[in-house]
């Protein structure tokens, strides 16, 4: 989790206070992960132990889309195939082309561009 987060922060240069969503996974127990968040003024956010899907609806929705639109459509034989499939889905489709009703039917990249240029 830390390597892609470092890459995202380096490329996107988020404003201080950006909330990073998690599900209380192993990354939240990692001192390196927590230190990276702190050093970059990022705020950890994760669901409670007895969470409902509403607590982290955006992340739950993303995972549902990833499964339906990508993973269930392919037979993955190894880690490299899985990594490539997921990377391409996120970078080439989900962020750049897939429209989202929650952001005025824009793709995440188009929405971010609109916000930055406002």
Residue ranges and their predicted role:
Residues 1-118:
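Charged DNA-binding/catalytic regions of mobile-element recombinases
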């Amino acid at each position: 989790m830390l390597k892609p987060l470092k890459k995202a922060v380096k490329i996107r240069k988020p404003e201080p206070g950006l909330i990073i969503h998690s599900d209380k996974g192993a990354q939240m127990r990692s001192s390196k992960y927590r230190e990276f968040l702190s050093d970059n003024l990022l705020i950890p956010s994760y669901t409670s132990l007895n969470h409902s899907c509403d607590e982290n609806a955006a992340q739950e929705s993303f995972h549902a889309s990833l499964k339906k639109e990508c993973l269930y459509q392919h037979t993955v034989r190894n880690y490299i195939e899985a990594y490539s499939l997921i990377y391409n889905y996120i970078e080439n489709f989900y962020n750049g082309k897939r429209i989202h009703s929650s952001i005025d039917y824009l793709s995440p990249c188009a929405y971010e561009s609109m916000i930055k240029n406002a």
